[in-house]
């Protein structure tokens, strides 16, 4: 703490990201990165941007990427917002859409950045308990609110809320913005983007860090009614008019255009997930149903924190959350078959 800090900074409780180990020999199954590389076409497109044009500012609107997203999902570019990772997109959403008198609602088990944003922007919030199966009860959100946000599939549980239930939540909250955070939707769910033309209060966020293997590039997006998108553009242009560099815009656009590679990579992750679930269940683990590129598992005879520490000593990193209701679970990223086998060998 410095004497130069403002009182505001002193009271901030920042987000704690997953560990990024420096030792290459570790099997990294803790931050939900894709074990398969980006689209080769996207890599080639980015290499093409490494020229004298880097002396010029990038397109502040990211129109090439907006067009690619719009074509992929069957919406218009005016319904698309892009930013420097979905975390930045979410920050703009909190800043521009959730600062009202009533509290923001989100699940008690969800992305731990949500309360951080609330602290940063002075947003009152209420964490609504998931049911015993870690699912949202729609009736629990039938109360005055400044908005609703939830991850689908849930992070960190991986549990999926069906699209029909998402629509029921929208119908029950027509006067509030409902944000569906779809960081992991491509690994087993149905996107709510198909609903944006019917619900002007719906905003869907996604990232290219997971299913499109571009975590190191930092690209995120939101899709919704043009009025909601305009609010995000106003916040963006009051903060950073050039959030995406030239290579990121082109590489992300091509990642959307290369559907064949994207579908192949997702399919491999899903197949590996189902194999790993079976292997862990055979070892006595309870594994929650997952529609993500990770699983949430616990063992009735093992303390999760101690197990995570022992796995690390054997060169395998998984994520443990010291949080009520889930303190005995481990979140395990789906790796390549070889990475998953290393986990199983360590458990043995």
From Swiss-Prot:
PROSITE patterns: AA_TRANSFER_CLASS_2. One of its GO terms (molecular function) is histidinol-phosphate transaminase activity. Its cofactor is pyridoxal 5'-phosphate. Pathway: Amino-acid biosynthesis; L-histidine biosynthesis; L-histidine from 5-phospho-alpha-D-ribose 1-diphosphate: step 7/9. One of its GO terms (biological process) is L-histidine biosynthetic process. Pfam families: Aminotran_1_2. Its EC number is 2.6.1.9. The keyword Transferase applies. It catalyses: L-histidinol phosphate + 2-oxoglutarate = 3-(imidazol-4-yl)-2-oxopropyl phosphate + L-glutamate. The modification N6-(pyridoxal phosphate)lysine is found at residue 210. Disulfide bonds: none annotated. Keywords: Amino-acid biosynthesis, Aminotransferase, Histidine biosynthesis, Pyridoxal phosphate, Transferase. SUPFAM superfamilies: PLP-dependent transferases. Homodimer. Belongs to the class-II pyridoxal-phosphate-dependent aminotransferase family. Histidinol-phosphate aminotransferase subfamily. HAMAP family: HisC_aminotrans_2 (MF_01023). This is Histidinol-phosphate aminotransferase.
